[in-house]
Every structure is written in structure tokens, then in C-alpha cells.
Amino acid sequence: MTQVYNFSAGPAMLPVEVLRRAEQELRNWHGLGTSVMEISHRSKEFMQVAEESEKDLRDLLQIPANYKVLFCHGGARAQFAAVPLNLLGDSNSADYIDGGYWAHSAVKEAQKYCTPHVIDVTTHDNGLTGIQPMKQWKLSDNAAYVHYCPNETIDGVAINEQPDFGNKVVVADYSSSILSRPIDISRYGVIYAGAQKNIGPAGLTLVIVREDLLGKAHTALPSILDYKVLADNDSMFNTPPTFAWYLSGLVFKWLKEQGGLGEMEKRNQAKAELLYGAIDRTGFYRNQVAIANRSWMNVPFQMAEASLDKLFLSEAEAQGLQALKGHRVAGGMRASIYNAMPIEGVKALTDFMADFERRHG
């Protein structure tokens, strides 16, 4: 059987070791004779899953004690609404950094609840898209918070700086880069992330929120999106997505076994350098992102001859290189190389790219 590597942007591949363990435990979890999917979320057995997964996540990210960790429904799009409705308080304004598709999507949702001050930080030099340094961002004085997206999956654009905005409340959509490297949680008021890229399967959303920001929710905010309600109920205000929570907990344990986020940073950098090196080697492939802002997680690329795209994708699929088609907005190709993608998968892709170029260049 051909070795398959899944380059999907999300839902994305999970670590093989995690899938094997889940397979082994599926029908008889911890000797109960039932699946973890079938037990009550309030049972002592599942409460142990919840407690261990939060502890492991706190260890991985070094989350300070004055932050709550919430396991939620709704994906990042739900957080596009939850953030303003939880944080605006008496304000009607927030700074929104527009650096790409998902940042702009957050702006569109926020416009229902406030008047976002939109700050376009993209640059376009010599056909390459980049991001202004944070010190050049023109933040307003009275914004309730500053929202940005550190990694744009479609554009393949990353903001690698950590924010240093004094006492401003910083909110970040880390859906596609959480757990890929160490970050300083204390620089943020809220971090949120859909699970389906670097955490676990779709259906779970992670929120990390500083405690002093709780209790400011708009009266019209649905309780299921209220950070304080969720925190007060240990993320069990209603039935949570238990199987996704359990699998994410297995991923957290796998990350710790691999050496933590410092080790993942080294691996992710090596994978990205290998793939970008293959793209840059000749003019056959190209990436249109400034080097300083190239994403380690999502690598879009095009060919000089766009007519070859379909052939490239079909041949890649036949070689076990799946889900390389670019987003419908961007076209071309895109390789998403999250934590679970081994460097062997990237090597298989770059070998195929070189062979394809030899035959069609």
C-alpha cells in the first residue's frame, strides 16, 4: 500500500500514534466495556480526561495561573462573535489588524456588534505579500482590545512577532499555529483556536482567557458563548464534544512525549525550510510571500504554468500526497504541514516536486 501523507489545511492529519491508541481504546475504554464517546461527560472517568488534558495543555504552553482554559463548541467563527460580546463592555470600538482572509472575516463579524478600527498591515513589494512590523501598527488609544490572526492559512502569511502593546488587551486567533512553537501567554488577554489543525479533530474550540476579563459580557450574549459561564462550569455548561476533547488530550500527551513545544519548533522550522527550499530552487514553482512572513504551517505555491496544476494534483494524489489543492480563493497548491506531519512527508512531497519539474519543466 502506498504511504499516504495528508496535507489538508483542516481538518488535518493527526499523529499516527494518537490514532492507533484511539483505535485500540475505541470499543473498550479503560476496561469499562464502552467507548469514551458513550460515557457521561460528568462521570468520574471523563472528568479525569478533562482534568488531565487541561493540565497537559497548561504544561505545554506554560499558561499562568490567572488564565482560564475553556473547551468550547462552535469553531473560531463562533469566537468572531464571542470576542466582542465578551470584551467590549461599555466600549463600541476595538482595533482589528487586517492581515489576510481570516482576520478580515473576524472584522466582518465584529461589525455586527461594534465599530471596528480596521488596520491594514499588509505590504506588497515586488509581487510579494508581507506584514508591517508591529511597531508600525497604528493602534487607537481607546480600543477595548486589539485583535489579530498570527497565521493566515489561505495566504500562507505569518506574523511571527509576539505582541508588546503595554496594557492593551490583545486577542489572537491561533487556530492554525497554536502548539507549533512556544509563545508567551502573558502577552495576551484572550487566545482562541479551532481544534482541527494542530489540536485535534473538528468540533472543539480552545479558549484561553485572563481572569480579569471575565464578567463583562453583553446582556444579549448567548450563555454558551459567555466565557464566565463556561469558566464557572468547567466548560460543562452543556454537553461538550467529549470525543474531540478526549482525542485532543491524547495529542497533548503525544506532544509532551515528543519533547514539548521547543522540539516542535525545531521540527516545524526544518520542514518549512525543506519545502520552501524546493520551491525557491528554480523558477518552476513560486511562493508569493515575503520571506520574513512565510508561514511554517501553510505553504501555498504556484507554478509558472498554471495549466499544469491539475496534472500536478492528480499525479501527487496517485503518489499518496493528498489534499494539496489550494483554497478556492487563492488557487494553485497548498501544503499544510502542522505538527503531525513528519518530515518524511515533506521529503516525499519535495521529491515528487523535483521529479514533476524534470518531466514537465
Curated annotation (Swiss-Prot):
Residues the entry annotates as binding L-glutamate: R42
Cystine crosslinks: none
GO cellular component, one term: cytoplasm
CDD domains: PSAT_like
Pathway linked to the protein: Amino-acid biosynthesis; L-serine biosynthesis; L-serine from 3-phospho-D-glycerate: step 2/3; Cofactor biosynthesis; pyridoxine 5'-phosphate biosynthesis; pyridoxine 5'-phosphate from D-erythrose 4-phosphate: step 3/5
GO terms for MF: O-phospho-L-serine:2-oxoglutarate aminotransferase activity; pyridoxal phosphate binding
Positions that bind pyridoxal 5'-phosphate: A76, R77, W102, T153, D173, Q196, N238, T239
GO biological process: L-serine biosynthetic process; pyridoxine biosynthetic process
Biological role: Catalyzes the reversible conversion of 3-phosphohydroxypyruvate to phosphoserine and of 3-hydroxy-2-oxo-4-phosphonooxybutanoate to phosphohydroxythreonine.
Protein name: Phosphoserine aminotransferase
Species whose genome carries this gene: Yersinia pseudotuberculosis serotype O:1b (strain IP 31758)
